[in-house]
């Protein structure tokens, strides 16, 4: 039996964490742990917290006076906050494959939901495992299909602890460990009244039974179990605030929808925008989901309130995990990351959820990174950052060589305050990632400090925004004669960025 299997069999022999507490009994290890050093340098632990579908502007202290996230606000004061971080695809699986490999979605081969990541792709967790890290996961992974009740296929992902759960449904009766735990607790997850499907609803259940709290419990158990060992990585993949907008009533009751601003939408703004946005205006997800048209402004505000309420619970659990780090004496040598896999339109531009569009609400996400004594505490940077940059950053922090295939750029100079700039532009793509539209959307987006351009290959048309004059991305200048020179220049930038994403492997061995 190898080290990974031994860790898997022994790490969670301790009893379950008491709900609402950060305390856990340390697990009994039966394998000599390798030194917490590489080339004489101490290797940091990594607590990697990934929310699902949380957009960039949903943290207290980041220009949002309506949401309550005191723990994230405190974490920001101790961390580097990268306010302009962009995913490389606005949909779950392609985005997750991208940031876990440090490679662009089309390079990994996982461009759309329902596809499986190639078996030879190397996740950063697998590289860390090979270097001696004990890697654990609680929650979602989503690097291969999960439809029809099947547990997603796993490549060599490096996780010796794999507590998998996906969404709220019970379509994985033998695999969704959160739902299995609910069954063991004798708890039945409530279903909403028929009239509230597709709208906000306060679930009448104790928050300790949510997938968010369950993931946090698993992480806390892992953290305490590792206190005398190391290095380790714990990947916490919380499903909230992903739709449906169903927080527990405890959290929803803290928000008055009347106090929350309406979505950013100007009547008629979609007329000169791609047809996919008009379809999703009538009903998200290709016409099958939430309709902006057939819901009221009160509904829109209430859905935003519910979304904020879910994020507040995420914040509560972040606080519990950070407390566990402190209690276990590991906070000083642990990198803490808080981020999301993509955003949510949340009614902006008359659209809910996600799809083939590249507005800031869809592709821009939170990114908070703390490493005491190494990264500059309290720094807030508006440098352009791509999610592919995270994997090489973690390897550099651990003193591990960055593989040839990684396409991201290490953020270390930015995080340490050595530089204030990182990229000239960000790149994002959508290649029929949801399979809900006709014609299939095949699109690429590039933005720099002033402009954003999107090109839809099947439509032979696109979007062009002057972000300095129109930060809300309301007015599409694609056909505006006054913007043609700037648009053409951005098209050249887009072509250059697409060429930059060509796979650097296999390595050339000789001239011929």
Specify the residue positions occupied by each region the protein language model found.
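A short, polar/proline- and glycine-enriched secondary-structure boundary/capping micro-motif
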Residues: 464-466
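Formylglycine-dependent sulfatase
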Residues: 2-456, 461-462, 471-492, 496-499, ...
């Amino acid at each position: 039996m190898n080290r990974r299997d031994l860790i898997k069999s022994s790490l969670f022999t301790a009893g379950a964490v008491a709900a609402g507490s950060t305390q856990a009994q340390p697990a009994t290890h039966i394998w000599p742990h390798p030194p917490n050093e590489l080339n004489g340098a101490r290797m940091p632990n990594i607590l990697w917290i990934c929310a699902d579908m949380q957009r960039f502007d949903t943290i207290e202290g980041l220009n949002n006076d309506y949401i309550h996230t005191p723990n994230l606000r405190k974490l920001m004061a101790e961390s580097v906050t990268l306010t302009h971080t962009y995913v490389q695809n606005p949909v779950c699986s392609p985005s997750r494959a991208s940031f876990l490999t440090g490679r662009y979605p089309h390079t990994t081969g996982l461009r759309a939901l329902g596809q499986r990541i190639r078996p030879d792709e190397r996740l950063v967790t697998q590289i860390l495992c090979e270097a001696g890290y004990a890697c654990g996961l609680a929650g979602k992974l989503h690097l291969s299909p999960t439809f029809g009740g099947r547990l997603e296929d796993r490549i060599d992902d490096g996780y010796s602890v794999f507590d998998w759960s996906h969404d709220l449904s019970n379509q994985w009766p033998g695999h969704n460990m959160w739902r299995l735990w609910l069954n063991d607790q004798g708890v039945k997850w409530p279903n909403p009244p028929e009239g509230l499907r597709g709208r906000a609803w306060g679930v009448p259940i104790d928050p300790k039974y949510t997938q968010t709290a369950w993931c946090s419990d698993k992480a806390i158990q892992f953290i305490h179990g590792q206190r005398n060992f190391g290095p380790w990585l714990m990947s916490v993949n919380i499903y909230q605030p992903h739709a449906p907008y169903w927080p527990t009533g405890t959290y929803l009751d803290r928000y008055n929808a009347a106090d929350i601003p309406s979505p950013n939408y100007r009547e008629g703004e979609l007329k000169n925008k791609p047809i996919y946005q008009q379809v999703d205006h009538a009903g998200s997800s290709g016409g099958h989901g939430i309709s902006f048209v057939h819901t009221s402004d009160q509904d829109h505000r209430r859905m935003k309130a519910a979304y904020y309420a879910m994020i507040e619970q995420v914040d509560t659990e972040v606080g519990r995990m950070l407390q566990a780090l402190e209690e276990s004496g590991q906070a000083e040598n642990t990198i803490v990351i808080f981020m999301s896999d993509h955003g949510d339109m949340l009614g902006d531009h008359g659209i809910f959820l996600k799809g083939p569009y590249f507005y800031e609400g869809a592709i821009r996400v939170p990114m908070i990174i703390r490493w005491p004594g190494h990264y500059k505490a309290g720094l807030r940077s508006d440098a352009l950052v791509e999610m592919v940059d995270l994997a090489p950053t973690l390897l550099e922090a651990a003193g591990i060589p960055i593989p040839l295939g990684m396409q991201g750029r290490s953020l270390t100079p930015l995080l340490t305050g050595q530089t204030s700039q990182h990229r000239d532009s960000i790149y994002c793509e959508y290649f029929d990632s949801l399979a809900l539209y006709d014609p299939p959307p095949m699109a690429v987006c590039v933005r720099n400090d002033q402009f954003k351009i999107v090109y839809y290959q099947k439509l032979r048309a696109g979007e062009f925004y002057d972000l300095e004059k129109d930060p809300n991305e309301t007015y599409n200048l694609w056909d505006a004669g006054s913007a043609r020179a700037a648009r053409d220049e951005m098209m050249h930038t887009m072509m250059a960025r697409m060429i930059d994403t060509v796979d650097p492997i296999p390595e050339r061995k000789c001239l011929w």
